[in-house]
């Protein structure tokens, strides 16, 4: 090996990121590090398309399936875990692969040192979002943090709630916290950046094929296991695409066919949102692959 290299591979769900990462890892004798917020959770092996046992036996994979789904795992915790890996593997080539744009941005730009938000505050605002809707909370956000409100959509419920819960818990605006960032773990010019975006029709075909395969491999058993944990539906792991839809099927609220079609629809929409985010947030240093 000529020297340590760091490769970042981002892209929407079902774009072929993991296969590309595996190929490059074998060529570079590199480690693979998860950069996807859902693949960190235990239990959700099939539904989040985590690497197979064959993959992990071929190349060492880190930060996959090690977080209890009852926990609210944050980007700050992920950065802390990445930092430990960087200190452990000081000369090994690394590949960061996943579909969570916020993780990549935090890796390259650092994050704000926002204190942990108490669960009671977090749940209060999520319940208000469900009850009052994003637009009503958006108007409230304008009153407490106009700088941030100007930057986000009135329909972006998650970001609106995040800003309100931070203000509620800390008495400081999220826009204030965002000015105080940690030092990036990886310098922007010290990595190869690959953005994988297949043609839309091909991507949708892959999504449908993979979801059908997930059912054959036992995705419903994972949903049953999650249901037995009786976790709050507000937890991130319980919001993984496939969990709410198939729980509704198991509860007799819709047919299996309706649930599966809904999962396919939600996955397509998620992929579309990912693509939009990557194109709007990533700069020209990212090499676009199709």
From Swiss-Prot:
The keyword Transferase applies. The record marks 100, 122 as: Interaction with substrate tRNA. Its EC number is 2.5.1.75. InterPro entries: Dimethylallyltransferase (IPR039657), IPT (IPR018022), P-loop_NTPase (IPR027417). GO terms for molecular function: ATP binding; tRNA dimethylallyltransferase activity. Substrate binds at residues 13-18. It is an enzyme of class 2 (transferase). GO terms for biological process: tRNA modification. ATP binds at residues 11-18. NCBIfam families: miaA. Catalyzes the transfer of a dimethylallyl group onto the adenine at position 37 in tRNAs that read codons beginning with uridine, leading to the formation of N6-(dimethylallyl)adenosine (i(6)A). Belongs to the IPP transferase family. This is tRNA dimethylallyltransferase.
């Amino acid at each position: 090996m000529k020297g340590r290299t760091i490769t970042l591979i981002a892209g929407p769900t079902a774009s072929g990121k993991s296969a590309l990462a595996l190929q490059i890892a074998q060529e570079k004798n590199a480690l693979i590090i998860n950069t996807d917020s859902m693949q960190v959770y235990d239990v959700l092996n099939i539904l989040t398309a985590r690497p197979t046992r064959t993959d992990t036996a071929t190349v060492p994979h880190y930060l996959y399936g090690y977080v209890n789904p009852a926990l609210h795992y944050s980007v700050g915790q992920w950065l802390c875990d990445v930092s430990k890996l960087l200190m452990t593997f000081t000369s090994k080539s690394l590949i960061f692969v996943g579909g969570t744009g916020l993780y990549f941005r935090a890796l390259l730009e650092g994050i704000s040192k926002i204190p942990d938000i108490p669960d009671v505050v977090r749940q209060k605002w999520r319940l208000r979002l469900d009850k009052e809707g994003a637009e009503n909370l958006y108007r409230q956000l304008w009153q407490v943090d106009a700088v941030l409100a100007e930057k986000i959509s009135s329909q972006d419920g998650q970001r609106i709630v995040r800003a309100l819960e931070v203000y509620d818990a800390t008495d400081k605006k999220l826009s204030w916290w965002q000015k105080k960032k940690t030092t990036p773990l990886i310098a922007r010019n010290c990595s190869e950046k690959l953005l994988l975006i297949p043609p839309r029709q091909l991507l949708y075909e892959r999504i449908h094929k993979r979801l059908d395969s997930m059912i054959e491999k036992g995705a419903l058993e994972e949903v049953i296991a999650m249901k037995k944990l009786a976790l709050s539906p507000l937890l991130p792991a319980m919001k993984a695409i496939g969990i709410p839809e198939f729980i509704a099927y198991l509860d007799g609220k819709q047919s299996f066919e309706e649930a599966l079609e809904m999962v396919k629809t939600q996955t397509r929409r998620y992929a579309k949102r990912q693509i939009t985010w990557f194109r709007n947030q990533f700069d020209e240093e990212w090499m676009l692959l199709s």
